[in-house]
């Protein structure tokens, strides 16, 4: 824990959270740390997190965050129930095996966990060590008809979207 509030970047906030893929700033009050790196230019669904400090000697709890991304907005046309992720891939454990390909989407198996899931084909990359996935989750976000969501990518199996900084799937 730091004596004074420390603001950190460089390490995208989505990497601090194991089971979700969220780009929002993290206020770790118990450690006196605010992490603001939204993954710009590095992460799928990235956003700019700008820390707003209302006055010179403001307490950490008085600060807020404004976010920005340039993904297109969409008004949700239907309700969707939340389905918790069975996997949330991060770059440091992202090797996959392709099991099936369908147009713009692939069914893969995460090598270290054995979990099988669908993801956009465009999220895969290869190198001499194998086939790897970009950061992805199989979470289906809770979305209500009329919610404003951001469209990250459209696929034949649904859309990767962002709602309130959280990435996941939505079926229109």
Language model segments and positions:
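Feature recognizes metal-dependent phosphohydrolase scaffolds
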Residues: 1-172
